[in-house]
Amino acid sequence: YPRRLQAEVMLDAIDDLAGTRTDFPNLPPGTRAIALPDNSYNTSSPFLRVFGRPENESVCECERGQSSSLSQSLHLMNAGDIRGKLASGSGRAEQLAKSELAVEQKIEELYLVAFSRKPTPAELQTAVEYVISPQTDAAGAPIEPARAVREAFQDLVWALMNTREFMFNH
């Protein structure tokens, strides 16, 4: 049956998809969450706390929560650390927006990183239409094209990381 990814695995997967990294205090840059030596790093990572990285008060793996919660959904939708990963100047969305590849190739790259598969024809069509559609700001004024493409790729990364296929082992 499908099970949600463990907190550390999900954080590393989000970093892979977003093309970013999470730095932890007193550890070398690029240390992955799955390699954290102990639970003291939970306090510096709201993501790990919200997604249930155990405090290791016992040796039982049963201490780890696997249920989904409203706070987890809200964290993926609104949290500053997630928004920062999406908007990173060196992140995947920014790199894809600047890339000379065809839009279809860029979207295939996102799907391969997120799901280890190419998008279905329907998924590809929907994503391409979204990326190339004219974007407007809250007042209805057109957004500058480079910014619109960058924000469209940020939205696609965000949408993919919020799917069941991304968050769950099957």
Indicate residue ranges for each PLM-predicted region:
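Structural motif corresponding to the C-terminal cap of alpha-helices
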Residues: 81, 135-138
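Intrinsically disordered, low-complexity Ser/Thr- and acidic-rich flexible linkers and loops
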Residues: 137-145
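Globin-like tetrapyrrole-binding proteins
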Residues: 156
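Amphipathic alpha-helical segments that form the core helices of the histone-fold
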Residues: 125-136
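An acidic, gly/pro-interrupted, aromatic-rich
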Residues: 1-118, 160-170
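Ca2+-coordinating acidic residues in Ca2+-binding motifs
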Residues: 9, 123-126
